[in-house]
Regions:
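Glycine-rich phosphate-binding loop
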Residues: 67-109, 113
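Structural motif
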Residues: 25, 58, 67, 82-84, ...
Length: 191
């Protein structure tokens, strides 16, 4: 999709679920920090604007974009978060290093989404020039950090709704006698 002269960070605030009870982790690459800090500011502003309390936001820094995978994994394992936003920036250079890092980070974040039950939002700019990154981190094309924060809220909400739906399905099966619990089972009917 062409994005020339379009600000992609505009969104309908009425379409955003209530986020006041969600907790978010943000893992930020220190490489290209003039860009990643802009993305972080966009994410923080969007989360706060959508009623996420500041104390429900945890930030960790990692050295580079490739380390976002490990940082996000550890955030998922050790912090009680509803979603993680991985923020990074890789800019094309003279070697294939760009391709390897972009592919590795993309696959790593994808793997975390497949292997865990907590969404990890990909907010890694993979641009050909510094100007393209500037344009997407608070410039003429908006702020991908803002978009990532909105995606994180929506995905946390989907996760919450799926969990509630699963609980209701189990309760329905129990009440219908379709499944039976052994004594001491962790699944209980809530009235």
């Amino acid at each position: 999709m062409a994005t020339v002269n379009k600000n992609l960070s505009d969104y309908d605030k009425n379409s955003i679920p209530n986020a006041k009870d969600f907790r978010f982790g943000i893992v930020v690459s220190e490489w290209n920090d003039s860009i990643t800090e802009g993305l972080y500011r966009g994410a923080i502003e969007a989360l706060l604007e959508n009623q996420v309390p500041a104390q429900h936001i945890i930030r960790w820094n990692v050295p580079g974009s490739f380390e976002l995978i490990y940082g996000s994994k550890k955030m998922l394992q050790t912090q009680n978060v509803d979603a993680v936003i991985a923020i990074g920036c890789v800019i094309q250079g003279q070697t294939k290093h760009f391709d390897f890092v972009c592919e590795g980070v993309t696959q790593g974040i994808k793997d975390l989404n497949v292997q865990t039950d907590i969404p990890v939002i990909f907010c890694v700019l993979t641009d050909n020039t510094m100007q393209q990154s500037i344009d997407r981190s608070g410039g003429i094309h908006g702020n991908k950090g803002t978009e990532a924060a909105i995606a994180a809220i929506k995905m946390a909400y989907i996760r919450q709704q799926a969990s509630l739906s699963h609980q209701i399905d189990n309760q329905h099966l129990l009440s219908a006698g379709a499944i039976q619990l052994e004594e001491g089972s962790p699944l209980e009917l809530k009235e």
